[in-house]
Amino acid sequence: MTNISLTIKAANDQKYAVTVDSESSVLALKEAIAPVADIEKERQRLIYAGRVLKDEESLKTYKIQDGHSIHLVKTLGQNPAAAATNVSDRTQQVPTNIQAGQGANNPLANLTSARYAGFNIPMPSASMFGPNPENPVPPSTEELANMLSNPMVQSSINEMFSNPQMLDMIINSSPHLRNAPPYVRQMMQSPEFRRAMTDPDTMRQMAQLHQQMGAAGIDPMSLMGGGLGGAGLGGLGGAGLGGFGGANNATAGIAGAAPVDQTAAANTIQNLLNNLGGAGFGAGLGDAGLGAGLGGAASPPAPAQDTRPPEERYAEQLSQLNEMGFVDFERNVQALRRSGGNVQGAIESLLSDL
C-alpha cells in the first residue's frame, strides 16, 4: 500500500494537506479531512474534475494521484437530535431575533439573500460560507428578478407568508409591524401581495420607472401620495402594478378593512422589506424602487447596472469554477447569476443539476 499526499482546497482560499492510502475510499478521505478542516465528514462534499466523489468509491476510481488537488464544499448538515425532530415541530420553534443578523438562528437567512433561496428547502445558508468576498456589492435588479423567477424561491416566499409562525416572527421583530393594525396581516396573507412579492416583472417595471423618474429629477413619492395606494401605481397587484384594491385605498380589496393611515401603512410595509433584507434582498428591492412603490421613504436612485459581459463580470468566479472542473461556460454563468455571483452558491446550483 502506498500513501499519497493531497491538497484539499476549501472556501476563502484555505488549503489543507492530508495523507491517505492510495486505495482508500472517499469516506476514509473525508475522515482524514475532518480534524484538519474542522468539518464533520457528513458535511463534506468533495469535488474532483467537476465530479462529486461518492463515499463508497475508492480514490483509484477517480484516478486521484499523489499531489492532486480536491475541492471541499461545506454542506448543510444535521446532528442526530435534530434529524429526529419532526419538521412541523421545528417550524413552530422559530426564533424571534431576526434582526440579530444572518446567522444560523435566522430562519429567513436562506430566503433573504440573492445567493440562496428557500425556507425549509435543502439549500445552504449564506452564513455557512461567511462573508462573500467575491460579490460584496448588493445584487442588481436583474439578479433579483432572476432569483424570483426560480420556482423554489416563489414557493419559499409563498410558504413563508402562509406560515402563521413565520408571519408572527416577522411582525413581532419590528415595532412598526408589531403596532400595525390587523389589516396589515390580512394584506400580507393575501394572494395579491404574494404575487407581487414573487413577480420578477413587477420588480423590473418598478426599477425602470424609478430610474426614469430619478433621471428626470422627479420624486416618485410625489406622484403616489406617500402611500401604498397612490395614484398611478396603486401599490401592488393587478397587472403587476395595478393595486391591491383601488387607487386611494390599499386595503379596499380586503373584506371589512377600514380606511387606513397610508403613511403608517407605507412605513409598515417598508419595514417588512427591511426585515426581508438580510444581505441584499431588501436592499435590492429598495434600490429597484419597489420599496418606494410600496410607499416607504424615498430610496436613493438605483446604482447603474453592470453591463459588462459575463466573462468580465464573473472572471474570477469563472476561473475558480473552471479549476474545479466545471467548464461549461453557459451553465457556469447561469449558476453565478442565480447565486448572485457567489462561487459556493453556484457550485451547489451546478451540482443540483447533475
From Swiss-Prot:
Location of the UBA domain: 309-353
Keywords: Ubl conjugation pathway
An example Gene Ontology CC term for this record: nucleus
Any single GO BP term: ERAD pathway
CDD domains: UBA_Dsk2p_like, Ubl_Dsk2p_like
UniProt entry tagged with the keyword Ligase: no
InterPro entries documented for this protein: STI1_HS-bd, UBA, UBA-like_sf, Ubiquilin, Ubiquitin-like_dom, Ubiquitin-like_domsf
Keyword Metal-binding carried by entry: no
GO terms assigned for molecular function: polyubiquitin modification-dependent protein binding
Alphabetical list of SUPFAM superfamilies matching this protein: UBA-like (SSF46934), Ubiquitin-like (SSF54236)
Gene3D superfamilies in alphabetical order: DNA helicase RuvA subunit, C-terminal domain, Phosphatidylinositol 3-kinase Catalytic Subunit, Chain A, domain 1
Limits of the Ubiquitin-like domain: 1-78
Function of the molecule: Protects ubiquitin chains against dissambly by deubiquitinating enzymes thereby promoting protein degradation.
Name of the protein in question: Deubiquitination-protection protein dph1
Organism, as annotated: Schizosaccharomyces pombe (strain 972 / ATCC 24843)
Name of the coding gene: dph1
